[in-house]
Each structure stands twice: as structure tokens, then as C-alpha cells.
Amino acid sequence: MPRGLELLIAQTILQGFDAQYGRFLEVTSGAQQRFEQADWHAVQLAMKNRIHLYDHHVGLVVEQLRCITNGQSTDAAFLLRVKEHYTRLLPDYPRFEIAESFFNSVYCRLFDHRSLTPERLFIFSSQPERRFRTIPRPLAKDFHPDHGWESLLMRVISDLPLRLRWQNKSRDIHYIIRHLTETLGTDNLAESHLQVANELFYRNKAAWLVGKLITPSGTLPFLLPIHQTDDGELFIDTCLTTTAEASIVFGFARSYFMVYAALVEWLREILPGKTTAELYMAIGCQKHAKTESYREYLVYLQGCNEQFIEAPGIRGMVMLVFTLPGFDRVFKVIKDKFAPQKEMSAAHVRACYQLVKEHDRVGRMADTQEFENFVLEKRHISPALMELLLQEAAEKITDLGEQIVIRHLYIERRMVPLNIWLEQVEGQQLRDAIEEYGNAIRQLAAANIFPGDMLFKNFGVTRHGRVVFYDYDEICYMTEVNFRDIPPPRYPEDELASEPWYSVSPGDVFPEEFRHWLCADPRIGPLFEEMHADLFRADYWRALQNRIREGHVEDVYAYRRRQRFSVRYGEMLF
């Protein structure tokens, strides 16, 4: 290879990242127009397009590099010089952290995810820690209640870039003041002020005003979801002011916000429970989130004396799941062979996981990160898990002596399996869990997702008590399913027969059958019948299908119905 080529390659990679991020910003900047035009299908398409941008531009850069090098192989010293040149380009580069992840992606594509060493990749950042903590420009504006909170909120709302009419701005402002007074008290509220992000956060059918409520005793989140009426008028649906509520809004089971990456550091104060990876994931920088997630894993591994074990819960028929006992993620490997009743391929399973990545997860499907050639030290693997890996996934494992390499796996947020949760709780907690499970099914269905296997073991409970679906191998679109009523028996003997008295075709689903496994527990059955009996009726599911086919996009709320202003204060007049 001629000398000087290393710098050209480094510049080509960085220029490729510039092109990718420019398109990312272009798609993001269209969010306001899509919201104002209530073009909800364009919102969904933009989300998918933004996800695909990254891999598309990595592919373009890889092709450029193959042309530059004429397809010649490169030695280790050459690659190290490329990385050195790339590193020298970053000190004055504003998006250095994401640019490092882009370099990693190009390298992995070129070398088929092999030889992934810290010398060749930015496994940890090349830049000093202070750069991560520096906010490059003012990202928010302060508002003080010099003339009272009504005047303050009027200024905040009037500053918004939205061009639609408000349904009743005065009403919404009084709702917010009432909520803040109930939360803080009159005296504390008078001594507090707001800091509001310059950018609105767009997701699904809402535009979120995100701010910080700075009080005498500390800083709280200040989140206002702005929706549209059927007539295209704006209204504020609620006000959220706790870190738990904010954490759910920015949760790992939700679609990515249409907003800019520079806001990550600013958000950290109101989302103290979120890791850096989770913050980048929330705003749609999922590839850099993957880098940060891997860094968090390495840091945890360095500081613990734990071994990987099989994850608690009922063993899956498709996935082998393992974890570190104190770590908040699970690792999922597709088995070499599935249980006989699982008539599918590994490629089908991967396609299902990709569908979830691109689809609106409505707060009910866990996001995942996909890794290839994942290296584990044998000393970190319990003997029982090693035996299980070799038994269930040997075709995906390469033995390197002191290490093994797993050809492909997913990393996902760890939750308590719902079946275990239901065994451990009672009273109101049990009731809440059953309500959450039914709501999860409804919201998935409204988003055109049918889970397929609805057993409790395929759902998890988050630290905030939300129920989230995480087993995707049987997932499909609602519009692909044929929901049928079970025909009446022809003779009394039909109900006693081992085989059904009616024909069953692929894609047929009989909701009446859900009752057999969802209501078998006498503690759960009555609660389910009380709250979710309509899930056992085929006509309920067919009605949802009709709404989807008619193009209706359901509203998705990141909070409980009882928190909506229309429910809390609906009868109040201002």
C-alpha cells in the first residue's frame, strides 16, 4: 500500500459519517412538518428510513474504500495508522463520539466482525472525558416567574415553533399550574423556574416539550406532551414531573424520538437512572448506543467477580438466554435446533427482531442490540452455562482456548419474567400486573403487532412495573392473522374429541382459546375476566384489524390514563 493512503481512508470514513449524519438531521428536521400535517404514516416511514440510513452509508463507505485500495489486503500496521489519522481528525470535530462508532461499523463490515481489538477499534473513546460533559451551545432557555406562573407558561407556549391553533391555551396553562401546585406547594412553586429545551421532541402523534423544573430542593423533569384534536387544534394532555415518569417516556421499549444528539448531556440531569447508552438509544442514535452499551458491559465485567449463568425463568424453545447476576442486561442466542412445535428458521427469528427494531414499539416491546462474533472469557462462564451453550448452540460457538466466540447474539434490557412476577405478588400489585398485561396486548394490537405466543413467560416487568413483550419469534402483523370464532359443536361428542371438529388453516387464531392458559390460575382468571374479557372475542380483534386497514393510527401514551388532564381536571372550567 502506498504511504499517505491511510489519511485518505481516514478522511473518506469521516466524510461518509458526515453524509450519514446530515441525512439523519434532514429526516429529523422534517418532524415538525409531519406533526403539523398530522401525516402519521409519514411519521412511521421516517422512523424506518432514519434507522436504515446508518447501514446504508456504512455500505457506501465500504465500497469507496475497496475502490481506493483496489481490493488489496491490508496488514495490521496499516490499519493502526488509519486509526491514528482518524483520531487526529476528531479533537475539533463536534460529533466525535458518534464518528468513532461509525469508524467501528466500517471496520466491522470490512473485516466481517473479526479481529475486534482495542488497538484497531474505538472500543473506548480516544477523546478525554471532559468532552463528553461539555454542552457545545445553549440548548435550552430559562423562564422565571417574575409576573407569575400564568405569564411564564404563556411565554413558554408562545415561544413554541408550532403553527397550528390551540384548542384552549388558557385552560391548559391552568391545568399545568394546578398540577405544579399540587406537586410542589404554592410557596415552592413561587421560588421555582423553568429551563426548556429549544427543540421539541417528536414521537408518534405527539410533540413533547421537555424541560427542567428547577426548585429550591432540586431539579425535576418537566414534560408536556402536545397532541392534536381531530380538528387539528393543539392541546396539552398532561404534565409529568417525576424522574420515574420521565424514565418511562424515554424508556427502552419505546420508539426513538426525532431530536438532535447534542441534547444527550443536557437530558442527563432529569434522567439520572438512564445510562449513556439508553439516552442515545432514546433519540435514535442506536448504533452509538450499541457502542456505549458494550462499554458499559466491559466496565461492569472489570469490576465484578460474577460468572454468566442461565437467566431465570422458563427455558425458551428458540432462544438460550443468559446473564450476569448483577447486570441489568440479558444475552440471547438463537439455538441450533428449535423445539418441534416451533416450525421456523433462524433467519425468520432474526427477521422478527429486525421488524421490532423498525416498528413502533409503543412502549411494549423491548429494544435489542445485535452483536456478531461476541467474545467471552471462559473464566466468566459458569460450568452449567458452558455445558448448555455447547448443547444448544454449538454451531454458533468457536473455541479459542481461554475464550469462546459466539457468532451472533442479542443484548436486551433485563426484566422480571411476568410469570415469576405473578407468582410473587398479590393484592393490588397482582391486579396492576394483569391490567398492564392486557393493556400491553391491546397497545401492541393497535400498532398492528400480534405477539403470537401470549403466554405470561414471554413478557417481562420493568423496574417501573410496566409489562413489556420480549419474545419475538412468533410475532407478525395483525393484518396477517385470521381471527375466527370456534364453530358450535356438531354433536355433544365433538367437545370431548382429541381433534377439533373444524378446519384450521395457517394464520388462523381462535381468541376463545386464550382463556385456557391465561385464566387457568384461580387468582388471575377473575381479574382477567373483569378487565380484559373482550380479548377472548374474535370480533374485538377483527374490529382492530378494520381500523388498521382503514389507515387509522392509534394514540400512544407513555403514562396512565388517570394522569391525563381530561381525566384529572376534565370538569373544571377556566
UniProtKB/Swiss-Prot annotation:
Q: What is its EC number?
A: 2.7.11.5, 3.1.3.-
**Compartment(s) where it occurs, according to its Swiss-Prot or TrEMBL record:** Cytoplasm
User: Per UniProt, where does ATP bind?
Assistant: 311-317, 332
Select a single GO molecular function from the record's annotations and give it.
phosphoprotein phosphatase activity
Which UniProt key words apply to this protein?
A: ATP-binding, Cytoplasm, Glyoxylate bypass, Hydrolase, Kinase, Nucleotide-binding, Protein phosphatase, Serine/threonine-protein kinase, Transferase, Tricarboxylic acid cycle
The keyword Ribosomal protein appears for this protein? no
The annotated active site, in chain numbering, is 367
Gene Ontology biological process terms, A to Z: glucose metabolic process; glyoxylate cycle; tricarboxylic acid cycle
Q: Which domain of life does the UniProt lineage start with?
A: Bacteria
- InterPro entries for the chain: AceK_kinase, AceK_regulatory, Isocitrate_DH_AceK
> What would be one Pfam family of this protein?
AceK_regulatory
Q: Can you tell me which family this protein belongs to?
A: Belongs to the AceK family.
| NCBIfam families reported in the protein's UniProt record | PRK02946.1
PANTHER family, per the entry: ISOCITRATE DEHYDROGENASE KINASE_PHOSPHATASE, PTHR39559
Tell me which HAMAP family the record gives: AceK
Could you tell me what this protein is called?
Isocitrate dehydrogenase kinase/phosphatase
Q: What is the source species?
A: Shigella boydii serotype 4 (strain Sb227)
The encoding gene: aceK
